Amino acid sequence: MSALCDPPGAPGPPGPAPATHGPAPLSAQELSQEIKAFLTGVDPILGHQLSAREHARCGLLLLRSLPPARAAVLDHLRGVFDESVRAHLAALEESPVAGPPHLRPPPPSHVPTGGPGLEDVVHEVQQVLCEFIRANPKAWAPVISAWSIDLMGQLSSTYSGQHQRVPHATGSLNELLQLWMGCRATRTLMDIYVQCLSALIGSCPDACVDALLDTSVQHSPHFDWVVAHIGSSFPGTIISRVLSCGLKDFCVHSGAGGGASACGNSSQPPSTDPFPGSPAIPGEKRVPKIASVVGILGHLASRHGDSIRRELLRMFHDSLAGGSGGRNGEPSLQATVPFLLQLAVMSPALLGTVSGELVDCLKPPAVLSQLQQHLQGFPREELDNMLNLAVHLVSQASGTGAYRLLQFLVDTAMPASVITTQGLAVPDTVREACDRLIQLLLLHLQKLVHHRGGSPGEGVLGPPPPPRPVPFLDALRNHVGELCGETLRLERKRFLWQHQLLGLLSVYTRPSCGPEALGHLLSRARSPEELSLATQLYAGLVVSLSGLLPLAFRSCLARVHAGTLQPPFTARFLRNLALLVGWEQQGGEGPSALGARFGESASAHLADLAPLLLHPEEEVAEAAASLLAICPFPSEALSPSQLLGLVRAGVHHFFSSLRLHGPPGVASASQLLTRLSQTSPAGLKAVLQLLVEGALHRGNTELFGGEMDGDNETLSIVSTPLASASLLDINRRHTAAVPGPGGIWSVFHAGVIGRGLKPPKIVQSRNHQEVIYNTQSLVSLLVHCCSASGNSEREGCWGAPTLSPEAAKAVAVTLVESVCPDAAGAELAWPPEDHARATVERDLRIGRRFREQPLLFELLKLVAAAPPALCYCSVLLRGLLAALLSHWEASRHPDTTHSPWHLEASCILVAVMAEGSLLPPALGNMHEVFSQLAPFEVRLLLLSVWGFLREHGPLPQKFIFQSERGRFIRDFAREGGAEGGPHLSVLHSVLHRNIDRLGLFSGRFQAPPPSTLLRQGT
């Protein structure tokens, strides 16, 4: 009899139920009355109908006292729990506030949450069953766990969809959890099952888990909340069992092949979405079970993602280790790969859990070989379906694993190379499969990108739907730079795939990634072949993205000024832009449209490009100069600030390049400054002024053969302290001031009393040929800037350009301001000779400046070539002439060869005056005999020049414009000075005195007739 009372599978008779907290043991008569009352539902003593509460307690009493009544009592308790759940849902429906269960207010106080009088009964049931489990877990835990789990499944299925407060099973699993865990009856059943599983978890949990999974199969998906909650408490056990159960169900419903049904049945009508994220066919028997697995694992993924990932990867490796798949393999092993693919398709959470380690899992070549062998037995149709699933999964990959997955696929699909490391070779079949996978992926991404808005009919009656996200492309947003770098490697197939992917990414993320990708390509391309990738990308995006080039240009400039773009890439970016713009201007085979648009963008950002000419890295400054030298200027005039900024930066770059690279390195800067001088008169004046000032600056004088203006006097004075510094203070006070009218304190400052003369200056001069080359480069640039634009027909007989008098005047004024600023704006009229006594200091300073900077003579020659510009250098000519007169007067040598510099300066000075039409030809040729004369004779001739200029002052109003030649000339005959007068007589006297040596020169100093003067333009 006791055997009938034992639960199935019990090791031995459990004996009477424990009654530690229950009533005293019943007699046979009392037990008979309780049985009769339980069966009839009527009180045998009082004869009235038992209430639900009394009936339930009667059953609990029998459960304690009569083990054979276990099945009947447990079955009756199902109704008690069902009534309690119904009362709970009814109370929720009376609540006027809708919303999630955790946000709803508690039920009214007059209606108990567990039903009328059943809350205490539910609590007593829990106490009784828990006592049984604690007393004999091996006997009672399997029975009670099966009962409780089956009851929860029935309740979940029964009330799903019948009450508006119960969410649908296909909805949020969290809402179902919150609803049922808020019900006292279902929460009690859950606690009972958890206690059963806890009691057997260390010994034999299979009975409890099997009951859970059996119920899950029967009542899924309404039962998923139970499995999810229990899985959170026992993740290691539940996850493996759920996956195993799902795989078995998948094998049963998908047939022996394992993959055909998983990937779609060809007999079913085609779906608009080839890769559904959730089951779309309610009638398919397989879908509810695999959907339950997806829901359960998705709920557990947030906290137990590592356990799920390990279990999924274990299943994958076990399936590969089991041998080849196909029709001849074990069904569970051959269906594992399709099953895992289907799980990942239906659950983005599971895909994200695995994608992080998927690449590491597939990287060993042995794994790929095993996978290839495993799949080779599958039918072609199933392989195609699995390939389509794999394409969809890659397009849904997100996070950091997406880029790693892309790199893995591309590396695997690359053709074999002779430098492949031994042991890492990929089988050809695997390589071909990856090649096809990438091509299908690009095609699929193209469809997703260009059909993001949905079908044409969507949004007609309402707002348009939001664009569909593509997680794979979203994950690649932060890897545009890496993709561009890989593309520029120009490896076979790889750069074509990644270039196409860059185009899709640019369209998908517009307008952010398109300009960024174009900027990366332009800043990294090192050859025309690599640069063509940028032009091809632009050609593919120009239709889809408006304003692509301005955005790319602005973003790159922003990175340059922010310092995030390294100088080598900045220089390469600017050089590539210059190359594109040059292609457009030359009309060659290059992408002229791209070059023209980049030229427009560059012209709109001149203010941002100008500072790059001052970049500390020379290659960046030179690249910026190359771009600015050929990019078109805006159609409207440049603002004064923009113009001056460009001119200053261009002049600085000119001298910097001249110092570093010599004349060959200033081509771009010269072209830029020439173009700036042609923009407007203000631009011409600014270019000439800054060029002259820069050339005469102490930091650049040595480029043109000048002496470094070192303050050796100050250094020698400061080096040793003096006992008495009164005289030193006076000298400093006067010489440190701004140069003004001279005095006795500063004229002959040759040293310090008690310390001797000034130490001689240490002159470090450049190579003479280099100085000539540098000077010619500067003068050539000035000539190009001063040339009258559009007057090519007015060139001289030798093809020399006609210089603009206004431009030459600007050079002359700048010369005066640079050499002798205190005399700027002085009168142009030539003073008497006695006036030089008041300007001794200034004249000596001017003479010293000409000696230290030979470039001044070349600049005077340039000014003299455009009369009457030399008139504005009158103060310099006067000062230099006075200094030379002083020297020749003090010279005691028998000939002029002992003063080579003064001799050369005297010759150049007279020649320049003659070239500038300040002297008639007869007097202008006197410098030809200076080397044959004595110093006092040279002084006499220079005094005659002074006298002539005193009588015929160098005034611009004395010049007339000759339209035939397009220049100003001076008619000395009209002024009465064509024959030179008494000044020419001095020259003739000197010639007569040296007739034995200078007789052949007499013809050079005869005054020509007036008609000849006009014809010669002097």
Swiss-Prot record:
Acetylation: present as a keyword of the record? yes
InterPro entries in UniProt? INTS5 (IPR040316), INTS5_C (IPR029444), INTS5_N (IPR029445)
Q: What biological-process terms (Gene Ontology) are attached?
A: RNA polymerase II transcription initiation surveillance; snRNA processing
Modified positions (N-acetylserine) in chain numbering: 2
**Predominant location of this chain?**
nucleus
Q: Pro residues compositional bias: what residue ranges?
A: 8-17
Sorted keywords for this record are: Acetylation, Cytoplasm, Membrane, Nucleus, Phosphoprotein, Transmembrane, Transmembrane helix
Specify the signal sequence span: none
GO cellular component entries:
cytoplasm; cytosol; INTAC complex; integrator complex; nuclear membrane; nucleoplasm; nucleus
- Indicate where this protein resides in the cell: Nucleus; Cytoplasm; Nucleus membrane
Q: Can you tell me where the transmembrane regions are? A: 533-553, 855-875, 929-949
Recorded topology in the membrane: Multi-pass membrane protein
Q: Supply the Pfam families for this chain.
A: INTS5_C (PF14838), INTS5_N (PF14837)
**Stretches the record annotates as Disordered:** 1-26
Point out residues bearing the modification Phosphoserine: 278
Question: What does this chain do?
Answer: Component of the integrator complex, a multiprotein complex that terminates RNA polymerase II (Pol II) transcription in the promoter-proximal region of genes.
What the record says about family reads:
Belongs to the Integrator subunit 5 family.
Q: How does it assemble?
A: Component of the Integrator complex, composed of core subunits INTS1, INTS2, INTS3, INTS4, INTS5, INTS6, INTS7, INTS8, INTS9/RC74, INTS10, INTS11/CPSF3L, INTS12, INTS13, INTS14 and INTS15. The core complex associates with protein phosphatase 2A subunits PPP2CA and PPP2R1A, to form the Integrator-PP2A (INTAC) complex.
* The protein's name in its UniProt record: Integrator complex subunit 5
Q: Which gene encodes it?
A: Ints5
